[in-house]
Amino acid sequence: MNSVKRYLWFSQASLIICLLICYLMLPSVMDHNGGASNFGDGFPTVIPYALGFALSAVLLWVAASKLSQMEQKIRKTAALVTTIGVLDLLVLLTTFDRKANHVYYLVHDYLGAALFAYEFALSVWIVYKTKSYATGLFLLVGSIGSLLGLLSLVGPLRLLFAGQMIGGIGFGLVLTVGFPSVIAALG
């Protein structure tokens, strides 16, 4: 169980740290209300951007592999973690072609929306299962970040990347703190 928890932490930390490195390399993304995907557009930020998403996906799959080796009730949760990794990888892969034409752009945006929706739904489920004040607070943080991102897309705010980061940190905390509690309750 400890190895699953460790891989979940590393998956979320690698993504957040790599995106923060991207921001330090190219802070102007915030000036143009750009999202994290803009870091995948060119050198030098494409390297930590791709590394962050790829590492996150691989580490999530390792955690899922460990879950799939546990008792039957726990094994079923491996698919929940695998799905996040698949969506992370698809968002990464569609980043590079999104400016080629409108179809690629839409595919990337819809996959990003699917990742957000899945992470939000999973977070709500984890909070419901744990009934923990801490995971509820982390869900609130993620929701505030997501709201900032949404208002940046449709309104006057220019905080898309900040909203994505706050939302991602909130989800990462729900996943790394709450999900192991759900697994422990099943075992």
Q: Predicted segment positions?
A:
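Cytoplasmic juxtamembrane regions at transmembrane-helix boundaries
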Residues: 67-90, 154-155
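Juxtamembrane "helix-exit" motif on the non-cytosolic side of transmembrane helices
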Residues: 68, 93-102, 149-158
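N-terminal topogenic module of multi-pass integral membrane proteins
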Residues: 1-73
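Hydrophobic cores of alpha-helical transmembrane segments in multi-pass inner/ER membrane proteins
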Residues: 13-19, 48-63, 114-125, 168-182
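Membrane-interface helix-boundary motifs at transmembrane edges
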Residues: 1-4, 65-78, 128-136, 186-187
